[in-house]
Every structure is written in C-alpha cells, then in structure tokens.
C-alpha cells in the first residue's frame, strides 16, 4: 500500500493507520494514565484524538502541554460544549481520518503492545469484508473481563458472540469507512 501524504510536521509525513480516541469530561486527573500507556506503545502508527466534552478542569491545559512535548505520535484535541459522551463519540467520528479507530476511555489505558497487535492483525485481514476487530478487555491487574473467545471462533459479529453466551467488555476496533 502506498503511503498517503497527509501533512508534514517535524516528525510525521505518513498518515497514521489508527486513531485512538478518548472522550473526556473533567478528566485531567485520569488522562495522564491513558497518555502514559500510549507513550509505552512500541508501534507509534496512531493518532490520539481527545474530544473534551466541556471540561471545567485543567484538561485543555494538560493536553496542550502534551501536544508541545510529544514527538513520537500526534495528539489532536477538540473542545466542544458539554453534551454527553455520545456526542463526544459523534464528534470523534466526524474527525477521524485514519483507516481504523478505537475508543479508550479517559480512565483507561492501552495494554502494552496493543497498537502493534491491532495493526499486525489488520494487515492479515484488511482485504476481507470485515467491519473491524474484536479484542478482549482486562482490568488493571491483567484479569480478562468476562469470557474469552472460543478456540474455534475466528470470525463473528458482536451480537452473535453474545447470543452464543459470550460475556464481558470487549475492545472494538472499527474500520473507519
């Protein structure tokens, strides 16, 4: 696949594959954990999009500092009037320009190596007619939330997974188009 030119900053000339988006409302106290988990990613082929849903705390100031310091991945910030998490998701989807996207909540973190695993897996299945990928979620101690996937299950819809007895949170990575 030929690289798409998006823009040239001091560190990026190729369009990223993944947008990690984070809706946030008064989360200056939890966003550092999310940011640190993104800094630890071995693969930096992503953009972090923070949609601030009308925060009154120091979220904007904190993100501006990160934008000035961060050199390994792009951080985008959008402020909007408070309307609820669902409206922040809508704004995110209106502004995503990468092939894939995933939501990481403002009080969560991304597991080490997750970006690489997402992109490597996508490279293997991108030409199939998939809407995205489903992964397992874990708590901060690494315990899987709910049930894992049956060994025989290689593809499914999320609805069919739950109808077959699947349980727990799952991490959904969507094809943007």
Predicted regions and their residues:
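Cell-envelope/extracellular polymer assembly enzymes that use nucleotide-activated donors
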Residues: 16-19, 47
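Short beta-strand/loop segment that forms part of the nucleotide-sugar
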Residues: 45-54, 76-81
């Amino acid at each position: 696949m030929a690289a798409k030119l998006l823009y040239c900053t001091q560190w990026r000339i190729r369009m990223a594959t993944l947008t990690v988006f984070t809706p946030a409302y008064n989360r200056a106290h939890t966003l550092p954990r999310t940011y640190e988990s993104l800094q630890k990613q071995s693969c930096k082929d992503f953009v972090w999009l923070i949609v601030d849903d009308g925060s009154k705390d120091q979220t904007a100031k904190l993100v501006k500092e990160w934008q000035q310091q961060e050199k390994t991945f792009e951080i985008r910030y959008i402020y909007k009037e408070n309307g609820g998490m669902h409206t922040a998701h809508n704004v995110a989807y209106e502004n995503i320009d990468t092939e894939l996207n995933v939501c990481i909540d403002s009080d969560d973190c991304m597991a080490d190596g997750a970006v690489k695993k997402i992109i490597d897996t996508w490279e293997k299945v991108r030409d199939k007619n998939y809407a995205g990928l489903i992964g397992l979620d874990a708590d901060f101690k690494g315990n899987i939330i709910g049930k894992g996937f049956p060994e025989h299950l290689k593809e499914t819809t999320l609805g069919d997974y739950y109808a077959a007895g699947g349980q727990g949170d799952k991490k959904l990575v969507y094809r943007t188009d």
